Amino acid sequence: MTLTVPCLFGLESLVADEMRRLNLKDVRVENGRVHCDGTLADIARLNISLRCGARVLMELGSFPARDFEALFQGVYALPWEDFIPRDGEFPVKGYSLNSQLHSVPACQAIVKKASARRLGEKYGLETLPESGSRYQIQFSIIKDVATLYLDTSGEGLYKRGYRARNMGAPLRETLAAALVTLSRYRGKDPFCDPFCGSGTIPIEAALIAKNRAPGLDRSFAAQKWKNMDSKLWLEAADEAMDKEFHGQYDIWGGDIDPAAVELAKHNAALAGVDDCIRFETADAGKFHRDSEYGQLVTNPPYGERLLEKKEAEELYRTFGAALRDLPPKWRVLVLSSHTEFERCFGRSADKKRKLYNGMIKCDVFMYGK
């Protein structure tokens, strides 16, 4: 079967690398999604182990759909009864892009009607109870080609289960993990985040250092599916836990807000990595480190939601000045949507990478080799 992992734009290559490390076959990249060939066992492995992907979708079929009749017949032809039991709940959601069928609510209604008719005929029911487990149907219609999926994840994979509550504008865990991955941090050198907020970046760094799978402390929609043996999930969890490392790590998170620091400590405890991270109330404008090597990965306020633009610019200037004394072998990654970040920071980036934080277009400014 084909499995599809949607992701934030700009993270496709990182997700593809993750899938290859899990020995998935025929990994293929498109804008905003990565495909592979897989099995039911791979559904469990991907959900438990992926750090940067948004969710895991099982592809059911693809066909041309230039009008509602073609959409109905294409959906009706799919073997829904092979996946959805007679009492299964099957809500529908999706999107359309550059297609004749552009009304998403109308397409949702057609997909629901066609799948319900097929299931009703197969089970001999005029009305389907939908009282059982949830089988979320997703569709995409791109350039008049419809693709139908079942969502195996349920809640997005960014919901690791450790964030008790948010401070201000939180960074999604999947994006935080991507930033840490881009820094090439592996747990050997010091790791710092001077704008740690609720602790997401240091926590994801600790999970990466320990090689702890991010999905071990949560549940997934497909765990309740009748065609997914619970043994597959236990085996995937055992495989992931067998890969964990146990060592000493120098991971630090600082924030000027004491309430944020306390929340970060609480979240780290929920994630089981509080023994790996030091959190402190600290001013990023006074950041200093003497160690020869290290990684600094951070997401300062952008001036769009948390601070006014001028305040953000002054913050970047102060922070940039503090980092001028950082030893030259440190690697620094800063996520920002500010178009004048480099000017304010006082240094041009050695490398930049475009990606999105939610709906905000950002750059990752990368310094160091």
Residue ranges and their predicted role:
Residues L333-V334, Y367-K369:
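Long protein-protein interaction modules used by eukaryotic assembly/scaffold proteins
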Residues Y293-N299:
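Short SAM/SAH-binding signature in class I
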Residues L148-R184:
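SAM-dependent Rossmann-like transferase core, predominantly class I methyltransferases
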Residues L171-R289, R305, K309-E313:
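Conserved S-adenosyl-L-methionine
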Residues E81-F83, K286-E292:
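Short amphipathic alpha-helix with an adjacent loop that forms part of the alpha/beta core around
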Residues T2-Y135, T152-G154, Y158, R165, ...:
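Accessory substrate-recognition/RNA-binding modules or partner subunits associated with SAM-dependent
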Residues I137-S153, F365:
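C-terminal edge-of-domain segments
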